[in-house]
A protein has these predicted regions:
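Low-complexity, Pro/Thr/Ser/Gly/Ala-rich linker/spacer regions in secreted
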Residues: 32-51
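Generic structural signal for individual residues within well-ordered alpha-helical segments
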Residues: 25-28, 136
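Charged, low-complexity interaction regions
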Residues: 16-24
Length: 227
């Protein structure tokens, strides 16, 4: 059984983003071809849709319970450069900095639209990337603390309004091909443009939580969807 699981994981890694419908279907068909049977629910778990968490926020915004590409709330998931919908896992042969100028996101001169929205493209309606204003609303209406979930370090945001919470792992970020600050910091893209070179993001470090920070658009950050 363990060999079966490893093969399914290998297929997912090799043939695309786990959250893309075409990749999911290909993986299931590939598994059926190899084993002569339908894939078991372990594959479905890997590609499970996020759950919308209602924190009672004034705007009515609901937050996903996990990062894009994560099968569980505590997992890192995929990393995205700003304005691009193709995510990458840490350790893959992809250079976020060198390749950025040739991506669709590099050509954006305003906020991210739906065509370039990693949440909308990978998860479908009604999911979108959060704006910097939605990050501000999250921070203003929640308490937050550094904590662990099933052994993963991160920060839990708990609503001051209804007590519901979401956990954001310390996924770190990718600069070029190097993963940095994994397990100590979190960086989450918004859809809001900072400048020609920067995008706004939620950043949290040992020094505090910053809902409207901005960083180089070519960095590989996490994406947490909203609806």
């Amino acid at each position: 059984m363990n060999n079966n699981i490893e093969l399914k994981m290998h297929i997912l890694e090799k043939y695309g983003i786990a959250t893309e419908p075409k990749s999911i279907e290909f993986c299931r068909e590939a598994y059926k071809f190899v084993y002569g049977e339908q894939s078991s629910e372990e594959v479905i778990d890997i590609t499970a849709d996020p759950v919308a968490v209602d924190l009672g926020l004034p705007s009515g915004t609901k937050w996903a319970d996990r990062n894009i590409g994560a099968s569980k709330p505590e997992e890192t998931g995929l990393y995205f450069s700003w304005g691009n919908t193709e995510g990458h896992k840490a350790g893959m042969d992809y250079d976020f900095e060198d390749d950025y100028d040739n991506t669709p996101g590099a050509k954006l001169t305003g906020d991210i639209d739906l065509e370039h929205d990693a949440a909308h493209v990978n998860l479908g309606e009604p999911w979108k990337m959060p704006t910097k204003e939605q990050f501000k609303e999250l921070v203003e209406n929640c308490t937050s603390e550094r904590t662990t979930l099933n052994g993963y370090l991160g920060r839990r945001f708990t609503s001051k309004i209804n007590g519901e919470s979401i956990f954001l792992p310390f996924a770190g970020y990718i600069d070029g091909t190097s993963l940095s600050n994994h397990g100590s910091d979190g960086y989450y893209w918004s859809s809001s443009l900072g400048s020609s070179a920067y995008g706004y993001n939620l950043g949290f470090y040992s020094s505090g939580v910053y809902p409207a920070y901005y960083d180089n658009r070519f960095y590989g950050f996490s994406v947490r969807a909203v609806q």
